[in-house]
Amino acid sequence: MKIISVNAGSSSLKFKLFDMPKEELIFSGLIEKIGDQKSIFSLSYGNTKKETIMPVLNHQQAVKLLLDSLQINKIIDNLEEIKGVGHRIVQGGELFKDSVVLTEENILKIESLNDLAPLHNYANVLGIKAFEKNIPNIFQVGVFDTTFHQTIKQENFSYAIPYEWYQKYKIRKYGFHGISYKYVSNRTSEILANKDSKIIVCHAGNGVSLCAIEGNNSVDTSMGFTPLEGVPMGTRSGNIDPTIIEFISYKENKSIKEIMNILNKKSGFLGVSGVSNDARDIEISLQNGNKRSLLAHDVQIKRICDYIGSYYFLLKGIDALVFTAGMGENSSLFRKKIIQRLSFLGVFLDDEFNNSKGERIISTSNSFFKVLVIPTNEEIEIVREVCKIKN
């Protein structure tokens, strides 16, 4: 059974085609700069990789290009072979506790949450409607980044603000990276052979968050009402004193919108280092003696350890600490600096395993809890959800 996973952005469409239930990746690609005369269409299947520059004016045209390419490259004979499409949707609010079939009613509910994620949800719906137009009556499922965190208790998701703000506007912690956390949590349970395991997962890419998980349920997470809350990231500030916004507005004569743009897109690694938002560039720079790059790195490491300590206390001890996503999977320095700060908990790295690749345990056998690296796979988790609902 062939299922497509889709991640639609405002000017991009990322997709992967899987043969299920074998979970075999058949075809993948990315369409960038949608709405431009020089859109970039990249695709990959088998040993073949292609890139084409061409005008792609909207998401409907992007989906048609994807579907046509599947037939042109003889990946499928006809569109009837595609049995379902799973869409990553960023914000499900309190309306969605699990993945859902994308009926007209559910699409309207997703659109009603646009205030909570104006850029993301709008783009996600463009992707949904584009598939509807190209393959009428195709079975589509929405898989939300927020639903994994719907198990968080009210004392953990509430802000100490006027309660009417929550009642009127649903201002609360929602958390993100939930699709990744679900995949990694399930995989960790398999490795530990313990469905009730208590783990802390550090999802560290350009966006960074942590999650305390018990029995495959989210207990708390570092991102909040938006992905800006939590630890410093590639371009996001993470937690700051809110009065800084008013202070900078007065000092630099900037609007709130301008300052929020700086906190989202010009802070984090980029803001502190002045070098880059990319962790790889930061590591090269700090190893070459750049003090601001070292500061940017150390500030992030310190804040991550703050959350690990908090969640360790919340869970009353853990079975494992898990690293995933870009930095989490690929940076041995990142992991080493964190574990060094946690050594008082009785956890130590095996340097050989820390410096190797792939899914593995990287802690020593005498460590008080295990440290794992598990490459995330959000696309697989999305198509699994499609199959679960379809069946």
UniProtKB/Swiss-Prot annotation:
Binding annotation for Mg(2+): N7, E378
> Among its keywords, does the record have Cytoplasm?
yes
Q: Name one GO biological process term.
A: acetyl-CoA biosynthetic process
**InterPro entries given in the database record:** Ac/propionate_kinase (IPR004372), Aliphatic_acid_kin_short-chain (IPR000890), Aliphatic_acid_kinase_CS (IPR023865), ATPase_NBD (IPR043129)
Pathway the protein contributes to: Metabolic intermediate biosynthesis; acetyl-CoA biosynthesis; acetyl-CoA from acetate: step 1/2
Signal sequence span is none
Q: Where does substrate bind?
A: R88
Q: Which family does it belong to?
A: Belongs to the acetokinase family.
Q: What is this protein called?
A: Acetate kinase
